[in-house]
């Protein structure tokens, strides 16, 4: 009788685990499907800030954080600033999508400074399309260059942020991952370092985030792609003096 009870309990646990696993997979699949449909409906992500468009005073030229979810999560630095800070980060966007919406955001906001952060959503596709690695990296570089040039033509100074390194990749993600992503991040960052000129400065995030290691410090990450509040605080301690040093 005791054995039967234990066996029944074990089967029950396995059944509950299987149901929970199925529910998780169904939820994940549905969220992915919704994201895919949203991109098809609005490839540039112009709807992300539709409710805020036209609300900024016309006599202001703000400082704009522009990019993907890493920019979206970047809270404004603490401390006095002479600029209003506006965030125009959109989650999941590639540099191609960022480029698509750039003109609309620049025309609306007329920024004095653009803090540009993007590229990881291009590069994280490499494990799924290894045969396109060279083109993915080249397109990422070209799109970031075009964004920088468009910002400069609009009169904005540009702070180019290096692509954040990757955090710890969990065991269950490793089948969908590749060291090629790390190498591509390094390649794009080496290229970004060549783009500095009058009106374009580099903010190298990785010495702060990795502290000399190969991946982002655990305290600075919420997952392998995204930073914690502590990570952004660490970046802001270095970014704020840089922003204050820029000519007006």
Feature locations, PLM:
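N-terminal secretory targeting modules
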Residues: 1-66, 76, 108-109, 194, ...
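Loop/turn elements at helix/coil->beta-strand transitions in domains of secreted/extracellular proteins
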Residues: 60-62, 83-84, 109-113, 153-159, ...
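Mobile, glycine- and charge-enriched loop segments
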Residues: 40-96, 224, 231-233, 241
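Alpha-helix N-cap and loop-to-helix initiation/capping positions
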Residues: 131-139, 176-187, 223-227
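Oxyanion-hole/transition-state-stabilizing segment in secreted/luminal serine hydrolases
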Residues: 66, 71-84, 97-141, 165-168
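Substrate-gating cap/lid alpha-helix
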Residues: 168-205
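Conserved, well-ordered alpha-helix/loop/beta-strand core segments that scaffold catalytic motifs
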Residues: 115-119, 145, 152, 159-161
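Histidine-centered active-site loop/cap adjacent to the catalytic His
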Residues: 98, 201, 219-248
């Amino acid at each position: 009788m005791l054995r039967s009870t234990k066996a029944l309990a074990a089967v029950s646990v396995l059944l509950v685990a299987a149901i929970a696993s199925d529910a998780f997979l169904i939820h994940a699949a549905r969220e992915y499907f919704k994201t895919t449909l949203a991109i098809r409906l609005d490839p540039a992500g112009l709807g992300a800030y539709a409710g805020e468009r036209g609300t900024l005073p016309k006599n202001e030229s703000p400082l704009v954080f522009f990019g993907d979810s890493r920019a979206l999560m970047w809270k404004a630095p603490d401390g006095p600033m002479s600029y209003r800070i506006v965030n125009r980060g959109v989650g999941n966007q590639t540099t191609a999508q960022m480029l698509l919406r750039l003109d609309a955001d620049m025309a609306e906001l007329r920024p004095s400074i653009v803090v540009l952060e993007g590229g990881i959503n291009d590069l994280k596709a490499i494990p799924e399309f290894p045969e396109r690695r060279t083109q993915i990296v080249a397109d990422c570089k070209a799109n970031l260059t075009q964004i920088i040039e468009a910002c400069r033509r609009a009169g904005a100074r540009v702070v180019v942020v290096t692509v954040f390194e990757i955090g710890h990749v969990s065991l269950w993600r490793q089948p969908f991952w590749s060291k090629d992503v790390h190498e591509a991040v390094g390649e794009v960052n080496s290229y970004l370092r060549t783009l500095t000129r009058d009106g374009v400065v580099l903010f190298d995030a990785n010495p702060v985030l990795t502290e000399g290691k190969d991946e982002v410090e655990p305290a600075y990450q919420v997952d392998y792609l995204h930073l914690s509040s502590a990570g952004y605080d660490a970046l802001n301690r270095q970014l704020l003096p840089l922003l204050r040093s820029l000519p007006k």
